[in-house]
Amino acid sequence: MVDKRESYTKEDLLASGRGELFGAKGPQLPAPNMLMMDRVIKMSETGGNYDKGYVEAELDINPDLWFFGCHFIGDPVMPGCLGLDAMWQLVGFYLGWLGGEGKGRALGVGEVKFTGQVLPTAKKVTYRIHFKRIVNRRLIMGLADGEVLVDDRLIYTANDLKVGLFQDTSAF
């Protein structure tokens, strides 16, 4: 039985990375440094732009985050691909929250637009995931649109984020 809460702390997210939150067969979040959120502040099976589920999470920004030291020297900015990965992470987390089992894998995205950036002077990144469809058959898959905001300003959008849960990834 999955512990379906509306919010999760950093410790909860770290437990997910160790395979402890959604059970031995549930999907895991990555461990730091690839874990791209500090907390999940809202999870719901309704709501969002399509009323089919909604997730909101946050990442606290500080100049000491690992990517600012290498991307780019003298011009630090969070790589856009990390924001995209965070959205995929949250789609997979939601599938586990619903009780889905398997190893999460990003399957694609329809379109991504970057209209801003995350600098070391920012305070907070917010991720918003709006679910469009959940497939729960032999393959468990989530389809969603996502938004990334920095200090409450929209900077990335992604349409048709796809994540699947697989029992066996050896032939993937």
Swiss-Prot record:
GO MF assignments: (3R)-hydroxyacyl-[acyl-carrier-protein] dehydratase activity; trans-2-decenoyl-acyl-carrier-protein isomerase activity
Pathway stated in the Swiss-Prot or TrEMBL entry: Lipid metabolism; fatty acid biosynthesis
Cellular location(s): Cytoplasm
Keywords: Cytoplasm, Fatty acid biosynthesis, Fatty acid metabolism, Isomerase, Lipid biosynthesis, Lipid metabolism, Lyase
A GO CC term attached to the entry: cytoplasm
Gene3D superfamilies: Hotdog Thioesterase (3.10.129.10)
Swiss-Prot/TrEMBL GO biological process terms: unsaturated fatty acid biosynthetic process
NCBIfam families per record: fabA (TIGR01749), PRK05174.1 (NF003509)
Family: Belongs to the thioester dehydratase family. FabA subfamily.
Function: Necessary for the introduction of cis unsaturation into fatty acids. Catalyzes the dehydration of (3R)-3-hydroxydecanoyl-ACP to E-(2)-decenoyl-ACP and then its isomerization to Z-(3)-decenoyl-ACP. Can catalyze the dehydratase reaction for beta-hydroxyacyl-ACPs with saturated chain lengths up to 16:0, being most active on intermediate chain length.
Subunit record text: Homodimer.
Protein name, UniProt field: 3-hydroxydecanoyl-[acyl-carrier-protein] dehydratase
Lineage of origin: Bacteria, Pseudomonadati, Pseudomonadota, Gammaproteobacteria, Enterobacterales
